[in-house]
Amino acid sequence: MGNVFVLPTCLKPLNQILSPTSFIEIPLMRTIKQIHSAEYRPIDDLVTYSPLPTARLKQVDPFLFLNHHGPQTYPPHNRGLPFGPHPHRGMETVTFIIEGDITHKDTGGHESVIKTGGIQWMTAGRGLVHAEVSSEQFKQKGGHLEILQLWLNLPRRLKMTEPAYQGFQEAEIPAFISEDGGIRVQVISGEFEGVQGGYQSLTDVHLSTLHLKQGASLSLSIPTERNIFFYVVRGKVVVNKTPATMYQLVEFNNDDTTLHLESSEDAIVILGHAVPFNEPVVAYGPFVMNSQAEIQQAYQDYQQGKFGSF
């Protein structure tokens, strides 16, 4: 009988090392299609950058539109925000108050003043008129202002739903905070790490605001069937090995599930994801419908006073 020896573990035969049960599943990152820099589109004296829509990117279904106002400083005795009474139909608006405040009033009887760190979510549905202006205190005293407004589409079945509004001050928004304090996530709708958002979306949209300190890192898993909305409000981040900075929107492919985020400096990111509606979108002015005929009807209804008035 010849000499017998035992192979060290590291030299086990390949058919043992590569057994089906020995593989470790490595999550694959979503690939990035393109980085879009916002276009500068001032409104009177209001600093405004618009990353969506642009000539290169029409929508991230169902995310339709984003305006980033500021940051800027208003002097005392200013005119404040210029968004007086105007109508909407067929969509929703989500307003992020990073700094400053905003007074909301609409023909559905809703009225509020939301301050720094707060959120407003309005469902226009079948139609209403609203105004978004600065508070009297802000106009008198001035101060820092930075506000973003995101438009969300509504599917055909909900275009004519009942209008609704809900405002949240910063302290009212559920939040996830990491153990080391480097990550704070305001969960607006949907769920994040067991924290349920403050708003119940009609269309299962997830929306959150990520506040990241320099050096913080975060990994998320988002199903491939959901489109991702990712916009850098402040600072610099590296997402799936690609750098992105303030005023940039990251467009993803729907190929994998993992989102890995690292902050190069203190940063704020708006993160959303949703299943696309895959419906025709006809947007004209403040109305978002499925056909030109529906747009014409919206204008006619508004002119006939069917949206109400202040």
What residue ranges belong to the model's regions?
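Jelly-roll (double-stranded beta-helix
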Residues: 2-310
